[in-house]
């Protein structure tokens, strides 16, 4: 019987999780530890959020204008988005990226958001 590592096998994802945990301690930002734990889940349990859901949350006022939406998983392109949102995620589908940018929004990787905002302020986690 051979030993297999637990957790994600994607090397880039493992590095990101390590960096998120380090930032959580260094900047006293519990949001990064929460995101690291969510990204450590098996792939089938990770978040998959459609752009239509993000648009609905923005229209209802759940997502404020100054906040960055963080999806600890993949953003999918089902639905219509009319609000210009700033979205960070591990992955984006091609159509999701096109729809967000067409609505005047911005797509970021979680690593880009971490480097830009290490304190973790004004972040809304959506699953």
Swiss-Prot record:
Biological process terms in GO annotation: translation
GO molecular function: RNA binding; structural constituent of ribosome
Residues making up the signal peptide according to the UniProt record: none
Entry keywords, A to Z: Ribonucleoprotein, Ribosomal protein
InterPro entries for this protein: Ribosomal_eL18, Ribosomal_eL18/eL18-A/B/_CS, Ribosomal_eL18_arc, Ribosomal_uL15/eL18, Ribosomal_uL15/eL18_sf, Ribosomal_uL15_CS
Pfam families in the record: Ribosomal_L18
Cystine residue pairs: none
Lineage: superkingdom: Archaea
Keyword DNA repair found: no
Entry similarity comment: Belongs to the eukaryotic ribosomal protein eL18 family.
NCBIfam families recorded: PRK04005.1
Protein name, as recorded: Large ribosomal subunit protein eL18
Species this chain originates from: Methanopyrus kandleri (strain AV19 / DSM 6324 / JCM 9639 / NBRC 100938)
Gene: rpl18e
């Amino acid at each position: 019987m051979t030993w297999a590592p637990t957790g994600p096998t994607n090397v880039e994802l493992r590095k990101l999780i390590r960096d998120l945990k380090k930032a959580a301690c260094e900047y006293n930002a519990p949001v990064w530890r929460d995101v690291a734990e969510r990204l450590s889940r098996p792939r089938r349990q990770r978040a998959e959020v459609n752009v239509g859901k993000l648009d609905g949350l923005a229209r209802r006022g759940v997502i404020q204008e100054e906040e960055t939406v963080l999806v600890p998983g993949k953003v999918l392109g089902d639905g219509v988005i009319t609000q210009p949102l700033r979205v960070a995620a591990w992955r984006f589908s091609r159509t999701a990226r096109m729809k967000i940018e067409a609505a005047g929004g911005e797509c970021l990787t979680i690593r880009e958001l971490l480097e830009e905002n290490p304190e973790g302020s004004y972040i809304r986690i959506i699953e």
